[in-house]
């Protein structure tokens, strides 16, 4: 396993798969792995992975074994301490995420909720208040 500046940890299998993807992508020289989150999914945020040509303004660049991982500063706190693995079974394969900041997640593992999400917290409070009014 390789630690990426203590923000994100990629397992050896994840590193090998990223290297494989980079090697099979035409013009792969200089590509980076972007890891991020977008609002959405059934739990609040969805994980996002992409091979990108370079870092953008506001990105944190995390050197990895043979490639760079880039994370936008707005996602760093949601991803800090996350472990990315690559798993293969007879029926599926893909990257998996173990995120200590995820307070809830969906069944597929692609979406998570965080206690730091003020809109979700406010929404839960409002829903609870509506339920108690109906009781």
UniProtKB/Swiss-Prot annotation:
Pfam families: Fe-S_biosyn. Residues 117-128 have a biased composition (Basic and acidic residues). One of its GO terms (molecular function) is 4 iron, 4 sulfur cluster binding. Residues 106-135 are annotated as: Disordered. Residues 106-115 have a biased composition (Low complexity). Coiled coil: none annotated. GO terms for biological process: iron-sulfur cluster assembly. Belongs to the HesB/IscA family. NCBIfam families: iron-sulfur cluster assembly accessory protein. This is Uncharacterized protein in nifB-nifU intergenic region. It comes from Frankia alni.
